Amino acid sequence: MIERRQFISAVAGGTAGYTLSMPALAQSRVDMNIVSSWPRDFPGFGTSAQRHAARITELSEGRIVTTYYAAGERVGPFDVFDEVASGNSQAYNSADYYWKGKHPAFVYFTSVPFGMTNLEWNAWVGVKGGQDLWDEVAAPFGIKSIPCGATGSQMGGWFNKEINSADDLKGLKMRMPGLGGDVLSKLGASPVALPPGQIYENLVAGTIDATEWAGPYNDYFMKLYEAAKYYYYPGFHEPGGSLCLGLNKSWWEGLSAIDQQIILAACKEEHARTYEDVIANNGAYLDRMVRDHGVEVRGFSNDVYDKFYEGWQAVAEETRQHSELTRRVHDTYFADLKELGGWTAIGEIGYSNQRNRLMGLGR
């Protein structure tokens, strides 16, 4: 974890042409209202957002005063984008694929079906130009988005019946946002948009037949095992989900360089922390749900996965046709995925396959 004095020293040493002095560090108070799509104390995403807001204040030694509003406390969970774009609040903590209706290219900056893992996405956004494309998509709305949380590879979802073939998806009401929901539509299912705080109650009530959320660690605290018996893997829809801090662009550009660096550092720290949390806990919580709650973990068959991919190819082409910008984002994303994924297959997956074979790991 970055200590504040170490952080200031690093910024002072690494910012060309920018001289920090004690008066510069003692600038006037900056107020920062952060609205969120997550309920207060919501395990995983909600606690991450609250921790991140507090960390910004801590790194600034109390000068950037953050006030955090959970979903529904200031605006609804899906209203945070407009709240920040209008300037009523300075930032939101959410997932940018929720704004697919505003511009479909937003989805590439959370996760897309058959897309990048979190490690690949981090390289794309951080090194290979993905952040510049993200800025280009968000700028017309008056938004600047920064990575601020990672889910890791996700499970396929919770189902109240077995999925033995693609026919079992027909008529299924499933909570799945983003382009993954569009893929389900191609297979005859009915995707449903629900904010996180309403997933459990709708699954218990039978209003929906299935839902995706994240992975075992986050899903356990949602108590989804109480509402559905079958837990399928792997998820085709979000191979590496990323959360974000969306900032009012004008407000962001009016900040000093040091204040921008403080916010960026807090985001980078939280982005890594959430990924570490899920990697550290997913295996243990999956075992707990199987052992203590009788959850049946099932793998999607190759035939079902083939249909997911067939549906995705149709959705991808439709999405590309939206605009020149969407086409450019899509084509750049998947061109870079060929390179990044090629190495993942040889390096990460090649090694882990051999390790798991020899050590008997996996299901």
Segments predicted by a language model, with ranges:
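Long, well-ordered early-domain segments
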Residues: 126-129
